[in-house]
Swiss-Prot record:
Organism name: Wigglesworthia glossinidia brevipalpis
Gene Ontology molecular function terms on file: methionyl-tRNA formyltransferase activity
Full protein name: Methionyl-tRNA formyltransferase
Pfam families xref list: Formyl_trans_C (PF02911), Formyl_trans_N (PF00551)
Signal sequence extent: none
InterPro entries cross-referenced by the UniProt entry: Fmt, Formyl_trans_C, Formyl_trans_C_sf, Formyl_transf_N, Formyl_transf_N_sf, Formyl_transferase-like_C_sf, GART_AS, Met-tRNA-FMT_C
GO cellular component, one term: cytosol
Reaction catalyzed: L-methionyl-tRNA(fMet) + (6R)-10-formyltetrahydrofolate = N-formyl-L-methionyl-tRNA(fMet) + (6S)-5,6,7,8-tetrahydrofolate + H(+)
Enzyme class: transferase
Length: 319
């Protein structure tokens, strides 16, 4: 029986999603010897330095952190990485592209956990695009990295169903759970040399382009089902929005009126009640349930019904 060996890992990531994987690795038998994270950001009126979730965790565990701001600056850190003597680099939600030079450093190569079932939704926003497209399933794919984006051979894949109420936030949570288990299992397989590579079928690949904030403005000419998908895709960022009476409103949650699926009255306020704000679309009625006025906390429409009845007057058109 082959015994699993402890691997020396350099972890590349920045976000809260990445943080969950780093924590799982720190709790495993493997050793995280270095971190690649995005540069610190300045935040708030005081322009204070804001550390990423991954950097905070790395500092707590006293792990060496490298923060290049480009592929070129990462290449310049080649000697620093060599000194770490890592067996493998694990990439989870990291924005800087690794060059051939960096990819060739670890003896076991570099692997990337991607939040889709590759080759579907290669690129920067796979969860958002899966929700917008009405996909019924998504998942995680772990690939052996090459010098192209998300095209490397597949090492591990796990499927996750998408519910009609899922948002990007809820799917990230689901994928984090299955992804952490997958990473640990795959590392065991790699450490004993028992793993398979499956090459991707490029002919069925789709691309998930980066989210632009302008996409979040609600287009009431779309069918209700598409607006609902967008609202869920853009939760928690950049958050769908619209304007009414000169006020900027964020839409966090909505549902489709299944009893009126053929009505076409884009942007028209049809009713305001404890169920929500009923708005006509290109096809069907969308019921806005959770909104956020500028400078206020988000709230259910039914919790602030008097306020919303003054703002959303039946018959008016939302911009």
């Amino acid at each position: 029986m082959n015994s699993s060996k402890s691997l020396r890992i350099v972890f590349a990531g920045t976000s809260q999603f990445s943080y969950e994987f780093l924590y799982a690795l720190l709790e495993s038998r493997h050793v995280v010897v270095g971190i690649l994270a995005n540069p610190d950001r300045f935040s708030g009126r005081g322009h204070k330095i804001k550390f990423s979730p991954v950097k905070k965790l790395a500092k707590y565990y006293n792990i060496k952190i490298l923060q290049p701001d480009s592929t070129e600056s990462l290449d310049n850190l080649e000697n620093d990485l060599k000194k770490m003597r890592c067996d493998i680099i694990i990439v989870v939600s990291y924005s800087i592209i690794l060059s051939k030079k960096i990819l060739s450093l670890p003896r076991l190569g570099c692997i990337n956990l991607h939040s889709s079932l590759l080759p579907r939704w290669r690129g920067a926003a796979p969860i958002h695009r899966a929700l917008q497209s009405g996909d019924k399933t998504t998942g995680i794919t772990i690939i052996k990295m090459n010098d192209e984006i998300d095209t490397g051979p597949i090492l591990y894949k796990r499927v996750c169903s998408i519910q009609d109420t899922d948002t990007t936030e809820t799917l990230l949570n689901k994928l984090s759970i299955i992804g952490k288990a997958a990473i640990i299992q795959l590392l065991h397989q790699i450490s004993i040399g028992k793993y398979n590579l499956q090459y991707q079928n490029n002919s069925i690949a789709t691309y998930a382009k980066k989210i632009n904030k302008k996409e979040a403005k609600i287009n009431w000419n779309l069918p209700a089902i598409n607006i609902d998908r967008n609202i869920r895709a853009f939760n928690p960022w950049p958050v769908s929005y619209f304007w009414i009476s000169g006020k900027y409103i964020r839409a966090w949650k909505a549902k489709i009126d299944i009893n009126n699926i053929f009505i076409s009255d884009p942007g028209k306020i049809l009713n305001v009640n404890s169920d929500g704000i009923h708005v006509g679309t290109g096809k069907g009625i969308l019921i806005l349930e959770v909104l956020q006025l500028s400078g206020k906390k988000r709230s259910f429409v039914k919790e602030s019904l008097c306020l919303y009845k003054k703002l959303f007057i039946t018959g008016n058109i939302i911009q």
